[in-house]
Amino acid sequence: MGSLKLSTFAIVVCLSILLISPIEVNGWGKCDLRKGLCRLADTISTCDVPCRAVDSKYHGGECLNVGGGQGICWCCRDYDAAKSGAEKESM
């Protein structure tokens, strides 16, 4: 029975990863990079350090719920940095 729950959880996580598109989190700006799984029970965001290590444009991360006490780390950058980067790319 335990393996059935684990299999169901794995399927939910995989589908969530495939279906979730870049998001905007209130107060965080544009969150457009997934950086692995996180635990929702942690009081300190475990997403901040790995997200900052990816690139200096990311100021931290947010753990968003996918069920079963687990979440997906989304790395976030502020709106101004995202906007100025898009303007530079379009030139």
UniProtKB/Swiss-Prot annotation:
The name this protein goes by in its record: Defensin-like protein 95
Lineage: Eukaryota, Viridiplantae, Streptophyta, Embryophyta, Tracheophyta
One BP annotation, GO: killing of cells of another organism
Annotated S-S bridges: 31-76, 38-63, 47-73, 51-75
Family, similarity comment: Belongs to the DEFL family.
UniProt main location, coarse: secreted
Compartment(s): Secreted
Record keywords, A-Z: Antimicrobial, Disulfide bond, Fungicide, Plant defense, Secreted, Signal
Signal peptide (UniProt feature, chain positions): 1-27
Any one annotated GO CC term: extracellular region
Keyword Signal part of the UniProt annotation: yes
